[in-house]
Amino acid sequence: MTEAEIKDKVYDIIVSKMGVNKDQIKPESKFSDDLGADSLDTVELIMELENEFDVQIPDEDAEKIGTVQQAIDYIVKK
């Protein structure tokens, strides 16, 4: 899967889980500040990323994923 395909899937998950429009999402968007996620939203988003991309994201890594691009970069590395 290419980085562009991963980005598209991550954006789709964010739209689905957080109820934002795709055009509101930018790579530098912060889940909490820019997209309105609370801590539960963030946990659910991480779980959905794990399911969609078949990766395990340990809590210590999940805490470091605060922006859309950080999520994409993490998945690309796995």
Curated annotation (Swiss-Prot):
GO terms for cellular component: cytosol; membrane. Coiled coil: none annotated. It comes from the Bacteria. Residues 4-78 form the Carrier domain. SUPFAM superfamilies: ACP-like (SSF47336). Its main location: cytoplasm. GO terms for biological process: lipid A biosynthetic process. The modification O-(pantetheine 4'-phosphoryl)serine is found at S39. Pathway: Lipid metabolism; fatty acid biosynthesis. It holds the Pfam family PP-binding. It is found in: Cytoplasm. Keywords: Cytoplasm, Fatty acid biosynthesis, Fatty acid metabolism, Lipid biosynthesis, Lipid metabolism, Phosphopantetheine, Phosphoprotein. InterPro entries: ACP, ACP-like_sf, PP-bd_ACP, Ppantetheine_attach_site. One of its GO terms (molecular function) is acyl carrier activity. 4'-phosphopantetheine is transferred from CoA to a specific serine of apo-ACP by AcpS. This modification is essential for activity because fatty acids are bound in thioester linkage to the sulfhydryl of the prosthetic group. HAMAP family: Acyl_carrier (MF_01217). Carrier of the growing fatty acid chain in fatty acid biosynthesis. Belongs to the acyl carrier protein (ACP) family. This is Acyl carrier protein. It comes from Chlorobium phaeovibrioides (strain DSM 265 / 1930).
